[in-house]
Amino acid sequence: MPETATNDAKRDRRQAVLDAALDLFAERGFNGTAVPEIAKRARVGAGTVYRYFESKEAIVNTLYRLHKQALTSGILAQLDPTLPAREQFRVYWQGMAAFARNHPKAFRFLELHHHGPYLDDESRALEQQVIAIARTTFEHLREQQIVKDVPAGVVMAIVHGAFVGMIKAKDDDYLDLTPHALDAAEQCVWEAVRR
């Protein structure tokens, strides 16, 4: 077999393991998922899983960093600091919505695992970088008297909590998340945090 075909097959098996693990971690969580289940879902042997990842923790951390970076870079690529604060907030909200819509399993996975004790130092550092960006942004908006005079963490919790709650309501079939509903929710959350 040519070297290129061998490399493609290895990449495909590794990706199959990651895809299966994402499905299972999003469905069952970290503790509810065993490596043999990942192997079965990926249609590979358990030994193949361990050829690419030394442990279940290595798999969850690989997935966490991959999807956290995708979410963050997707939002940051759209943000324009020259826009008024209100428009920046809309872009941020729409960026989260686009990621949740286009990558629902990845979004669910990130929400289940962002505080897991199994995250390694690199994954925790990435989470802290993302939090620092949001914190700095909301602190700047508070200093400009655009958002309420409360700690940035409070504003972040309100915004993030409302968004995640809305996505969970949609996933549980309690909410039909139409574009109009998404825009209305964004307006309500902005009204909750603005001065």
Language model features: what each stretch is:
Residues M1-R28, G32-R41, A58:
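Basic, helix-initiating cap at the start of DNA-binding domains
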Residues N31-G32, Y52, P81:
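Flexible coil/turn residues that form the inter-helical turn or adjacent wing/linker of helix-turn-helix
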Residues A42-F53:
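Short hydrophobic/aromatic patch on the recognition helix
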Residues V60-H67:
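Alpha-helical DNA-contacting segments of helix-turn-helix folds
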Residues T62, L76-N102, V155-V159:
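Hydrophobic alpha-helical connector segments
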Residues R108, L112, R142-Q187:
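Hydrophobic/aromatic-rich alpha-helical bundle segments in the mid-to-C-terminal region
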Residues Q69-T72, Y118-Q144, G153-A157:
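Amphipathic alpha-helical packing segments from all-alpha helical-bundle domains
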Residues L76, L110-Y118:
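Short linear capping/connector segments at secondary-structure termini
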